[in-house]
Amino acid sequence: MIKLFNTLSKRVEVFKPIDDVVKIYCCGVTVYDLCHLGHARSYIVWDILRRFLIYSDFKVKYVQNFTDIDDKILKRAKEESSSMKEVSEKNIIEFHKDMDSLGIMRPDSMPKATNHICNICSFITILEDKGYAYSRDGDVYYSVFKNKNYGKLSNQNIQEQNINQQGRMANDENSKKLNPQDFALWKKAKDDEPFFDSPWGKGRPGWHIECSAMVKDELGDTIDIHLGGSDLIFPHHENEIAQSEAANGKKLANYWLHNGMVNVNGQKMSKSLKNFTTIRELIKSGISPMSLRYFVMTVNYRKPLDFTEEALRSASEAWKNINIALSFMDLTKGAFRYIDKNESIEEEYKEKISFELSQKKLKFSEALGNDLNTAGAIAIIYDLAKPLKNFLNQFQRVEGFKIDLNEKFFLIENFKTLEKLTKVLGLEKEVLVKESKITEEEISSLINERLKAKKGKNYAKADEIRNLLNEKGIELIDQSKEITTWIRL
């Protein structure tokens, strides 16, 4: 059973899909710049939701759009002396690079607003025909007061709304509107702007109508889950509901899920406040992609995530331990690849281990099924990683270490379970997560120096070299007194 907090009902509800395929729409980025940690949090969280649904045997169709026409894109194009298309296409490529680096599965479909202009115009025409929209000198607006249910998602009282709280609309447009709260469906083109032809003349779509049209075209009138950041609840998602339900006469989405913001010094991380850190900058600073992913999972997805160097370092250390456990097969040099046919293990012991691991998998599913409790899921991951890490400490440092057959079976099955469950969280083993300034030749030289120190019983010097290499992202593995291997962390 999967339970999710529905922003629409303001309570946790049991998830019941409409049909065999779970239809999900996630609001995508406006492609005018590189993505920051706030974007990373949102798309990591929803990637985990998608992965967990698939793990739970649901079929999923996941759609995420690109807003590729917008005031910010036009402004950036002017700054760079380029076109709107050049700016958006360049940043779409960079978006994919960032998301791929974080292990985020690509959506099944990623529609662009500019490819749906005909659908958008048709959608606006329906709203006009039904009396929900009106045109003024080439602009088209949605009449908020025509919709008695407006405000049901955000609990906004339209009588009390601030006139300036209109998303991406300029104040000088208010004079064209019947009411200050009405919002733009179509914007008349300015002399120096790119435009599209429409029944109302040359112009471009408003922000909110783009998503309504793309949801309908990609997934139909009613979808299972609509996703986004909590900053989109109003006005964007509220306006989506108003548009779609007025035009289609059906509920837009059964479940509305929103992730909390990333905060810096108590303020939302955003480009407008200039307090953001891009994903690229974080990774370049030495934070591995999986450490970043792990960091996002440490806090409930609906709560604010406080961005501090200390929290990132703590997440990196925690992930390092899990990553070592995920490297178990590599570090044991194939000794645990399989159980030989001639090696006999009691069925009673096999059943015991199988039951214990099935209980861990059950608790893992219960955690994620409880409104994506990633912290609870991580606790299970730690339970699985601990015996593998403990064994490696012995295996790497004790010469001639012998492996008990039952323990071998347990560790193999434990590793398989760990590998399976970390994939649900999108956590993948990292061999090289950051560039190291130390070369392989330098590593080998220091290892030889350390071996000489150990032979001379200069253990302080040996520890000093180990610590030095560890600071440079190198983990030493003592296979015997004379053989030491290493991995990059």
Swiss-Prot record:
Cellular component annotations (GO), alphabetically ordered: cytosol
Compartment(s) of residence: Cytoplasm
Binding site for ATP: 271
GO BP terms in the entry: cysteinyl-tRNA aminoacylation
Pfam families: DALR_2, tRNA-synt_1e
Cell inner membrane recorded as keyword: no
UniProt-recorded Gene Ontology molecular function terms: ATP binding; cysteine-tRNA ligase activity; zinc ion binding
Co-factor: note: Binds 1 zinc ion per subunit.
NCBIfam families, per database record: cysS (TIGR00435)
HAMAP family: Cys_tRNA_synth
Name under which the protein is recorded: Cysteine--tRNA ligase
Organism for this UniProt entry: Prochlorococcus marinus (strain MIT 9215)
Name of the coding gene: cysS
